[in-house]
């Protein structure tokens, strides 16, 4: 009976350990990101995605890292992954709108802005800024 309890205990420890380590990858990666250690944090966010492919926050932080590295293709890919997993992610939506504004994709910006107005709760103050930037760019194009 005691052997059975020991085996059961060991089994439980092994089952719990991987779930704890998954969370540690994200937490440690976020801490490194906040310290400005982008390469180290990028590796840990990618590692977290391997163990937890539905973690939208890891994709969001990877998008931020790729934005800092000026790698637009990877940035957009990770933003889209974030929005696929969490369509109401305000930060990802705002990043995508900003990216599309820089590329002068006005129709997409208008479409995304409508969605952004529906989902915004913390970044609603950015809506006026988006509309102003869109108006300024359109005015420059007309002149």
Where does each model-flagged region fall?
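Alpha-helical segment of the N-proximal tetratricopeptide repeat
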Residues: 23-47, 51
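Register position in tetratricopeptide repeats
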Residues: 34-35, 68-69, 102, 119, ...
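Canonical positions in the second alpha-helix
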Residues: 47-48, 81-82, 115-116
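Canonical tetratricopeptide repeat
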Residues: 61, 95, 129-133
